[in-house]
């Protein structure tokens, strides 16, 4: 379907279904799909679940017989001489009733979701699933029986190459605090970063590489950024106001009273969108790009001071995904990633949402200790209490990655002649960088 603009058509589909406040959010989901396809092009020539691989015992090992993402091509994107991961995992952060689940279900709902495929086990379309409300480490990543074999059907393995949704991400973060799932967070971070799952257990190893993308919702008070989740997730911020709540009520009423003719038209448009996304995946896998070239405008945008160094790769992935989902696709040549007006607006909006979330904790620390000089040990304790939920090591890392980059924060060793340990003091204030 040459000329079919999936960004415009998906927005039309959502607006005619009376979705509220989605114009700056839907493109991120589409870019996530595009970057997921690109990641498969780059990494799925090696598959731990390929029944034809000489390293896989088809009778005893878990296999995915029909995977539409599996291919025999060489990697095309290897910055720093490493095999880069380009998945965009999405975290929707918003209060209860703000429409987080509705956005995820628009793509992943069984039957009606734009990515759902009834024949996914036969290799048609993506593998998709809405995750359970409660999950353990063993249920997510696997455990072994007395003979060292992986038990059950761990989600991270089952959804390799697909999309896994969670209506409330706290079900996973809460599980990591229980004795039976202490390693949940570390396994999650690693599997989202490079796909590796590796657990040493008394009876054997849980070891495989998976390539699933996570879309999840969370409420602000339940969102923990202290352990590296912020580097693995693209954050979409959803605010809720009395006016927006009234708009939601009106939208629900209109959607309930939709005419039959309109429902039929929207069903056909949904089928078109499903078909286009599936065809784009199949076309790109069969005829992949030969490399990636970012133009200077992309580099200039990423060089902006408000984009932190560890965030630049997330926005680079967004740009890749955006171009993988353009109306006209050309394989067999490098993917030229340019900065058009729509991509620039998408990057600007995404950065603004990310700053709102990422800087909330920093503003709390700044306003609490403004114009004070505190011992470094006390600052670490306060950050641990206020930001990182009692994790002392995460608090020290948070200070290094966030506070130390601010012009209003300065660490110094006081000039004093008194005996004993001097220690480091931390100054919060407009003159933090002045000579002490």
Regions flagged by a language model, labelled:
Residues 16-26, 303-312:
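Structural motif
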Residues 417-420:
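Short acidic/glycine-enriched loop/turn segments that link adjacent beta-strands
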Residues 25-30, 316, 392, 396-400:
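Short, well-structured alpha-helical segments
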Residues 199-212, 220-363, 370:
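Phosphate-sensing "switch" segment of ASCE/P-loop ATPases
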Residues 96-97, 105, 332-401, 407-412, ...:
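C-terminal engagement/docking regions of AAA+ P-loop ATPases
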